[in-house]
Amino acid sequence: MNKWQAIKLAQRYKAAVAERLPLKALYLYGSYSKGNHTEDSDIDIAVVVERMSDDYFEDTPLLWKLKRKISNLIEPVLLTEDTNNPLYADILKTGILI
């Protein structure tokens, strides 16, 4: 899979997530955004919400359930816009806003 195919899958995933969660942003990050992906790479996606809901333990499995409808290569992570979070800070630097 090439970078543009990963972006297309991320766009489809964003549409599915936006129907179920109050989505603030969605980023493609990791190997596809950095350009060092291989044929075995997963598709790292950061789902950014304004704040975590009380249903975090329901929201996270929902992300995994929705990914199965798009591609099992998608590896979602649920985040807030906490710039003190090293993962989120890295995503802001190297990720692709979808």
Per-region residue spans from a language model:
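Catalytic core of pol beta-like nucleotidyltransferases
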Residues: 1-25, 33-39, 50-98
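Short beta-strand->loop micro-motif that forms the acidic, two-metal-ion catalytic signature
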Residues: 45-47
